[in-house]
Amino acid sequence: MKVLLLGDSIRMFYHKEVVAQLGTEYEVFAPQENGRFSAYMLNSLRFWLKEFPTPDIIHFNAGLWDTAILYSEDGCFLPATEYVRNMRAILRELKATGAKIIFATTTPVSNEKVHLQGPMPPAHRNEDIARYNRAVLNAFEKENIPINDLWGAMHPEKEKYLSEDMIHPNEAGVKLLGGMVADAIKRIGDYHNEKSTAASAPLLNKDEKTVQ
């Protein structure tokens, strides 16, 4: 079964863990580059989807770059409405491949990350990340795709799973996220192998705190 992973540097951190946990029954592909923000991912799909074999399953996320505060005067890098518009378009293009789609919520940052103002490095606020997660989940509510709630699993003990840079996962975080992604992929793969005529797949790891 062929799997395509799409995302930013968080995806790049957990990629090897996903490959290890999926084993030889799955071929895992991903762009070599960082998927960055939603508009960049949307534009890049024109090239990425031609670069790899047609996938059976696609697991994707964008959001950390979109919620980044590059300059304190400007707020989030992309407005939530533009983020949602881009994510809808990304989902449309991914669905057109015929693959089973899994969407992952954006992961939290350390509470201290808000204090890093200015152009380098950007600041993030968990309230913004949660707000963008809610917005995209509301937009995807009728799309009938599984949700892998990485935010919900990581947020309660985020400091345990974050590295010193306060945004990327440490070893424990890689194990957590990689395990969740691999498990979601296996469950969707098994589900559709056994019930290929079913109308919908179950939601995965969905935490109510994300959408409140």
List where the protein language model places each region:
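Catalytic nucleophile-elbow at a beta strand-turn-alpha helix junction centered on a G-D-S/GDSL motif
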Residues: 1-16, 37, 67
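Short, flexible loop segments at the rims of nucleotide/cofactor-binding pockets, characterized by
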Residues: 5-8, 34-37, 79-80, 124-125
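A short, Lys/Arg-enriched amphipathic alpha-helix followed by its capping loop at the start of a domain
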Residues: 14-26
